[in-house]
From Swiss-Prot:
Coarse class of the protein's main subcellular location: nucleus
Domain Grh/CP2 DB: 63-300
Organism from which the protein derives: Mus musculus
UniProt-listed PROSITE patterns: GRH_CP2_DB
GO cellular component: cytosol; nucleoplasm; transcription regulator complex
Name under which the protein is recorded: Alpha-globin transcription factor CP2
Region (DNA-binding): 133-386
Length: 502
C-alpha cells in the first residue's frame, strides 16, 4: 500500500525533471553568433504551434476579403519568419498600388455599378509615436512648409475618380473608384523615416511607417461612411535611391548566411500584399461633401492640382482681393487662413476674429509664427501688394486703332480741356514684372482691349526719328516711371498694327 502511494510522487518527480531537461535543451536551439538569441520554448508558445488554438479556427479564417491591395515594391529579405513584412521605399518616388476586387459572384451585389471610396494614410507603426502623431506631424509641417507627406501621382494612376487632398491632413489622400474596373494608384511618400527619430547624429535607424487603406461604400444619404475593408503594410522610407541600397545590403547579408540560418527568414517577394487590419479610428471627416481646401473636380488633373494647395480651391477669390475685414467672424477667419496658405496656424488662431488678427503687430506675428511665415502673414493681413519691377506710363497719340476696330471698344483716353493748348493727355500705368518684349506687348494689348496677336511689332522712336525694334534688353533698360506716347499704324497684314513708343 505504501509502495502504491509513493508511485505517483515518483512519477511527478520524473516528469518534472524531464520537462526541465527538455526546456534546458531547447533554450540553446536557435542561437546564432552576432545576433540576438531566442528560446525555442517561446517559439513553441506562438499561436501557430498551439494545438488547442489551431483546432478552433475563427469563423472568418476562410473568408475571402472583398478587396485586396498590392503594393508593387519588393519586401525585405531580412525579416524573420512570422514577423510582418517590411518594404523599403524611396522618398518622392511613385509606387503603384493595385486595387483588386476579390468578390465572389453574387457577393455584395449592392456594389455592382457603384463607386467606393478609399482613404490612403501614411501613419506611424510604433505605438509610442501614434500617441503623439499630431505633434509629430505639426513639427514636420513646421520644418517643411508647403510640402505634403503623401501625394497621388495622378498622370500615372488608372481608374482614380475625384481625388482629394486635404491641406490640413498632410498624410491623407482619398478618391473614388469602380471595383469592376481596373484601378491602380501611384503614391508618393515625401517624408523619410529618419525625420522622426529622437535625435539625429548620423547612422540612426529610421522609424517604420504604415500605409493603410480604408474603403467605404455609399449609404442611403449618399455619404461614404459604411466601412467595407481595411488593410495595411509596414514600410520604411529612405532618401532617393536609399531604398535600393538598403535592399541590396540586406540581400548580400542573407547570401552570406548558411542554409540553416536562411530558413529563419522570409524570402523577398516582388510585391507587398497589404494585410487586413482594423479601420483607422479617426475617420471623422469621411463624407461626400468636400472639406475646405479639397479639390472637388471630377475630371483628371495633374498632381499639382491635387496636392492640397489652397490656391486650387473652387470657391475663394484671388488672394489679392481676399482681404480680411474687421467684421470677419472667427469661423470666416479660419477659412481665410486656409485660403491664404496659413493652415498650420489655424489651431493657434481658433478664437481670433478679423479684428483680433488685424490688431496684431509685425513683432506679434513674427513671435507667434516665426520670421518667414510671420512676415508673410503680416503682409497678407495688411493687404500689401508686391511692388512691380518696372512702371512706365503710356498715352495714345493716334486714333487709327479706334477707327480700324469693327466695333467700338474701350480705348486709352484722350480728353480735351479748355487750357491754352486746347488738349491734354491722360496716361495709363503699365506694370512689368518679367521685363520682356512679350510682356510689354501683352500689357499694351490689354490696354487697347485687343489680342496680343494683333500687335505685329513694337518700335521705339530713336534719334532722327528712326524706329528701333523693342527687345528684352531694351525693356530692361527702360527708366523707372518713363513716359511714352503711343502711335499706331496699320501693319502689312490686315487686322494687325505696329505700335511706336515716342
Amino acid at each position: 500500500m505504501a509502495w502504491a502511494l509513493k508511485l505517483p510522487l515518483a512519477d511527478e518527480v520524473i516528469e518534472s525533471g524531464l520537462v526541465q531537461d527538455f526546456d534546458a535543451s531547447l533554450s540553446g536551439i536557435g542561437q546564432e553568433l552576432g545576433a540576438g538569441a531566442y528560446s525555442m520554448s517561446d517559439v513553441l508558445a506562438l499561436p501557430i504551434f498551439k494545438q488547442e488554438e489551431s483546432s478552433l479556427p475563427p469563423d472568418n479564417e476562410n473568408e475571402i476579403l472583398p478587396f485586396q491591395y498590392v503594393l508593387c515594391a519588393a519586401t525585405s529579405p531580412a525579416v524573420k519568419l512570422h514577423d510582418e513584412t517590411l518594404t523599403y521605399l524611396n522618398q518622392g518616388q511613385s509606387y503603384e498600388i493595385r486595387m483588386l476586387d476579390n468578390r465572389k459572384l453574387g457577393e455584395l451585389p449592392e456594389l455592382n455599378g457603384k463607386l467606393v471610396k478609399s482613404i490612403f494614410r501614411v501613419v506611424f507603426h510604433d505605438r509610442r509615436l501614434q500617441y503623439t502623431e499630431h505633434q509629430q506631424l505639426e513639427g514636420w509641417r513646421w520644418n517643411r512648409p508647403g510640402d505634403r507627406i503623401l501625394d497621388i501621382d495622378i498622370p500615372m494612376s488608372v481608374g482614380v475618380i475625384d481625388p482629394r487632398a486635404n491641406p490640413t491632413q498632410l498624410n491623407t489622400v482619398e478618391f473614388l473608384w469602380d471595383p469592376s474596373k481596373r484601378t491602380s494608384v501611384f503614391i508618393q511618400v515625401h517624408c523619410i523615416s529618419t525625420e522622426f527619430t529622437m535625435r539625429k547624429h548620423g547612422g540612426e535607424k529610421g522609424v517604420p511607417f504604415r500605409v493603410q487603406i480604408d474603403t467605404f461604400k455609399e449609404n442611403g444619404n449618399g455619404e461614404y461612411t459604411e466601412h467595407l475593408h481595411s488593410a495595411s503594410c509596414q514600410i520604411k522610407v529612405f532618401k532617393p535611391k536609399g531604398a535600393d541600397r538598403k535592399q541590396k545590403i540586406d540581400r548580400e547579408k542573407m547570401e552570406k548566411r548558411t542554409p540553416h540560418e536562411k530558413e529563419k527568414y522570409q524570402p523577398s517577394y516582388e510585391t507587398t500584399i497589404l494585410t487586413e487590419c482594423s479601420p483607422w479610428p479617426e475617420i471623422t471627416y469621411v463624407n461626400n461633401s468636400p472639406s475646405p481646401g479639397f479639390n472637388s473636380s471630377h475630371s483628371s488633373f495633374s498632381l499639382g492640382e491635387g496636392n492640397g494647395s489652397p490656391n486650387h480651391q473652387p470657391e475663394p477669390p484671388p488672394p489679392v482681393t481676399d482681404n480680411l475685414l474687421p467684421t470677419t467672424t472667427p469661423q470666416e477667419a479660419q477659412q481665410w487662413l486656409h485660403r491664404n496658405r496659413f493652415s498650420t496656424f489655424t489651431r493657434l488662431f481658433t478664437n481670433f476674429s478679423g479684428a483680433d488678427l488685424l490688431k496684431l503687430t509685425r513683432d506679434d506675428v513674427i513671435q507667434i509664427c516665426g520670421p518667414a511665415d510671420g512676415i508673410r502673414l503680416f503682409n497678407a493681413l495688411k493687404g500689401r501688394m508686391v511692388r512691380p519691377r518696372l512702371t512706365i506710363y503710356v498715352c495714345q497719340e493716334s486714333l487709327q486703332l479706334r477707327e480700324q476696330q469693327p466695333q467700338p471698344q474701350p480705348q486709352p483716353q484722350k480728353q480735351e480741356d479748355g487750357d491754352s493748348n486746347g488738349t491734354f493727355f491722360v496716361y495709363h500705368a503699365i506694370y512689368l514684372e518679367e521685363l520682356t518684349a512679350v510682356e510689354l506687348t501683352e500689357k499694351i494689348a490689354q490696354l487697347f482691349s485687343i489680342s496680343p496677336h494683333q500687335i505685329s511689332q513694337i518700335y521705339k522712336q530713336g534719334p532722327t526719328g528712326i524706329h528701333v525694334v523693342i527687345s528684352d534688353e531694351m525693356v530692361q533698360n527702360f527708366q523707372e516711371e518713363a513716359c511714352f506716347i503711343l502711335d499706331t499704324m496699320e501693319a502689312e497684314t490686315s487686322d494687325s498694327y505696329h505700335v511706336i513708343l515716342k
